Regions:
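C-terminal helical subdomain
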Residues: 161, 176-208, 215-217
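Active-site helix of classical SDR
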Residues: 104, 138, 146
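Conserved NAD(P)H cofactor-binding loop of Rossmann-fold oxidoreductase domains
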Residues: 73-78, 218
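Substrate-binding pocket helix/loop in short-chain dehydrogenase/reductase
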Residues: 80-90, 178
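Residue(s) in the substrate-gating loop at a strand-loop-helix junction
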Residues: 122
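Alpha-helical segment proximal to the catalytic Tyr-Lys
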Residues: 109, 150-155, 206
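Short C-terminal tail/terminal secondary-structure segment
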Residues: 209-235
Length: 235
């Protein structure tokens, strides 16, 4: 088992991509600590709350004494300029950017030799749809935070981010245009992200830090103009 007895922290690990990541680490022998707002057999808490982050970090260190891998995955909102309130926008940034920064700070002196931080961003850190400002701003923020932390923690902790594209967390299989619009010929699933997380956390990625890796089946490389290849903008 590649991660036997390694201590792994996953935020937002109750469902979706975070759950898949946590389960993959556990199968490889890791000791996995999860924090989520959903009730379950993990640390229950709101990542937007400073005191909760401090209690969670204290709990991890008290139980495990170190951190080998920190995966900042949690992200709560998807609202845009028409509907998103000031408070909702601030909350999205608190969970999506402030919490990853503060957890890195809280664990700074407890990271083991060769430790790794993996931040989950989004392909929306480089492209957008209307009415997605709260989510997009947070994902752009965590992508930038990644290279800043990589510089500050150089020689101690490797820090990288992953930008998923369309990931169906139910592992649904799509056909037709939904699939063919991707160069890879399909929609992604959580294992596509979990596999990269485990690679980046491993010694095989020992020379990779400060990087952002987009996993979107090639979608963001698909240059689209009206009337090209049957694409039509109806507006």
């Amino acid at each position: 088992m590649v991660f036997k007895d390694k201590v792994v922290v996953v935020t937002g690990g109750a469902q979706g991509i975070g759950k898949c990541i946590a389960e993959c680490f556990a199968r490889e022998g890791a000791i996995v600590h999860i924090i989520d707002v959903q009730e379950g057999p993990w640390f229950l808490g709101d990542l937007a709350d400073k005191a909760t982050l401090e209690r969670f970090a204290g709990d991890v260190i008290a139980k495990s004494g170190k951190v080998d891998v920190l995966v900042n995955n949690a992200m709560p909102l998807f609202k845009g300029i028409d509907e998103c309130t000031y408070e909702e926008f601030a909350y999205a940034q608190a969970v999506g950017v402030v919490a990853p920064f503060y957890l890195a700070k809280l664990f700074k002196d407890s990271f083991a030799k060769g430790a790794s931080i993996i931040n989950i961003s989004s392909s929306r850190d480089r492209m957008s749809q209307p009415q997605s400002e709260s989510y997009t701003a947070a994902k752009g923020g965590i992508a930038a935070l990644t290279h800043a932390l990589a510089a500050s923690l150089a020689g101690r902790v490797r820090v990288n981010s992953i930008s998923p594209g369309w990931i169906d967390t139910s592992f649904k299989t799509y056909d037709g245009p939904d699939a063919s619009q991707h160069f890879a010929g399909r929609v992604g699933n959580p294992m596509d992200i979990a596999n990269m997380v485990l690679f980046l956390a491993s010694d095989k990625a020992g020379f990779i830090t400060g990087e952002n890796i987009c996993i979107d089946g090639g979608m963001t490389r698909n240059m689209i103009y009206h009337n090209d290849f049957g694409w039509k903008l109806e507006k």
